[in-house]
C-alpha cells in the first residue's frame, strides 16, 4: 500500500517529510494517518543525524486543504468525534514537542486541519503565489478547529485576530499572513523548499511579537481586557447568527478557557465542543450542502453529453444584470465578452460596473492595476451586431418583453453560427415561448442569474422540451466557469426559485395587510434564519418586478399565486423600492445606516399596524408555503431531485443553511407534521395552504426525502 508520508534525508542533516495522498488531487487529513505520522516521528526522534525537519506537500497547488469531511459521518456518537479530535491533539503535540526545528513549507491551500498541522510546527514559510491561502473555515460547516487550532492560533496571532479568522472562516493571503505573524516568511515558490531548509538549519526561533494596536495590547494583556473582547465577540455572534448556529459561541468558549486555564484545559474543551458540534443537526445540514455542491461539480447537467468549449461570449443588454454577467464572464471565467446595447450610455454603464468591481480588488491589494486593466481589455462593446459572429454563447439580459426577445433570437440566428447558444436571463417568461421564434430551438436555453450577479452564487439553467443535451452541458460548464453553482431546471412559469419565493412573499404581504408591522415581519424571518426579511427583499428586488411576475404565475399555476392587493396600491403611489428611493423603507442621504420604515406606507395600504403576533408563528406561516411549493416543483419535474431543490433555495434566496434546505427541513419537521400545519392554516385562510398530494402520501406512508 502506498504511503501518504515519505521521509527523505539530506546530507546537511535536514529531513524532508513530503505529504502526498495517493490518488487525490489535493491533500486532506484522514483518521488513518495518525499511526503513520506517529511512526515517522518516532523514527525521527531515534535518528541523531537529523538536525531539522521540513514539512512540504507533494501536490501541485495544495499544502493540506483540510480534514477529510467524510470521516465525520463515520462518527456515530459524540464519543467517536471526541476521540478523533483527541487523536489529532496527540499527533500535533508530538510534532510540536520535537527537540529539532520543524518548519512547514506552504504552497497552495492550507486550510482547516492543514493550518492546524502548520501551527504545530515551530516556523512557517509560504509561497507568494495567489493560490496560497491560509484559514480555518470549519465554522462554515458548523464546526470548530478540532486539531488544536483554537489554542495555537490565538497564542500566535493574538486573540482578536484569531477570533476573527475562526468566527468568519475567512481565508488569508500570504502577505497578510506575514503581517499578522501567522507565517515567518513569504518567498517565491521556486525557493520555498530552500528557504524552509535554511530556516531549519538556523534552529528554533521564537516567533516575532505580533504588532498590536495600543488598544489591543491593553485588552489582550489583562484578564479584564480579555473578558471585554470575549463579551463583545459573543454579542456580535448572537446578533449575526440569531442563535441559529452553535459553533461560534463554542469557538469563543474554547479560546476563553484555554487562555484562562492553560493549553491542556483548552484542548480538552476543544475536543468536547468539537464532538458536540459534529453530531449537531446544524452541522449535519451544513455538511450535506458541502457534499451536495461537491457532487454537483462533477455533473454535466445532461447525462452523456460533452460540453462545447466557450471561447467567446456576447451579452445583449448593458443594464445592471447585463453588466454583472459581463463582469463575472471576464473576471472569473477569463472569457472575452462583447456587450451589445442600443445605447452608448448602457455600454458605458456596463464597463463602469465591471471596472468598479475590479478596482475594489486593486484597492484591497488583491490584484495589480495591470491585472485589472488586462481583464477589462477582455470586454468590448458595440451598438450593432458587429464582432458577434464567432460567439459560442449569447446571454440575453433585456426587458421582459416576449416580442423583443423573439426579435433577438432571429437576429442572433442570422448573425451567428449554427452552434451558437441563445441563453435568456428571463425571470418569468417560459423558455419554450422564447424558442418559438427560433429555427434552431435546440440552441435556446434559459440562464437565470440572481441580483447582484457578482454576489449571488446560483444560476438556474432552464431547459425546454427541445433544448439539446449538448446545449445544457455547455451552458452548465459556462456558468461554473463564472464561479456559479448551476442547477438544471425544466421550463415552467417562475422556474423553481421564483416560484417558491412568490408564495412566501405573497404570504408576508398578506400578513402586512392583516396589520403586522413591516419591521416585526422582517425581524421574524431574519430570526428564523433568512439573511433579510421578505419586505426588505421586496424593496431590493423591486415592487414593480414582483407585481409583474405574479399575474404570470397566477395564469400558469392557479389562484394560489394571486398576489394580495398591496402591490397595486404601492405602484399607484409610485413605490418601486430601493431603485427609485421609495418603498417600505426610507432611502436617500437622510436615511440612517439602520433603515427606518417609511411610516407613510401604512396609509397607502389603508392599514394601521396592530398588535404584533408571535414571531415564530409569522415565520412558520410564510415558510410552510415555500416548503409545500418546493415539493410541488419536484412533483412537476421542475427540479430533478430534493438535493437540487435544497441547493437552489439556499444559494438563490438564502433559505437558512443550518436547516439544510426546504427538503432537509421537511424531513426534520416530518411530512405528517407539515401536513397537519398546512391543513390547520387551510381551515383558517383558505385553499392556498392545501398540502400537495406527495406530502399527503409521504405523511401516510411515513417516508422522508433523504
UniProtKB/Swiss-Prot annotation:
Taxonomic lineage from the root: Bacteria, Pseudomonadati, Pseudomonadota, Gammaproteobacteria, Alteromonadales
EC code(s) of this entry: 4.2.1.17, 5.1.2.3, 1.1.1.35
Site (Important for catalytic activity): 116, 138
Record organism: Shewanella sp. (strain W3-18-1)
Domain of life from the UniProt record: Bacteria
Name assigned to this protein: Fatty acid oxidation complex subunit alpha
SUPFAM superfamilies per the UniProt record, alphabetical: 6-phosphogluconate dehydrogenase C-terminal domain-like, ClpP/crotonase, NAD(P)-binding Rossmann-fold domains
PANTHER family: TRIFUNCTIONAL ENZYME SUBUNIT ALPHA, TRIFUNCTIONAL ENZYME SUBUNIT ALPHA, MITOCHONDRIAL
Subunit and interaction comment: Heterotetramer of two alpha chains (FadJ) and two beta chains (FadI).
A Pfam family reported for this protein in Swiss-Prot or TrEMBL: 3HCDH_N
GO biological process, one term: fatty acid beta-oxidation
Assigned keywords, A-Z: Cytoplasm, Fatty acid metabolism, Isomerase, Lipid degradation, Lipid metabolism, Lyase, Multifunctional enzyme, NAD, Oxidoreductase
Residue numbers spanned by region 3-hydroxyacyl-CoA dehydrogenase: 308-706
Cross-referenced CDD domains: crotonase-like
HAMAP family: FadJ
Pathway: Lipid metabolism; fatty acid beta-oxidation
Region Enoyl-CoA hydratase: start-end pairs: 1-188
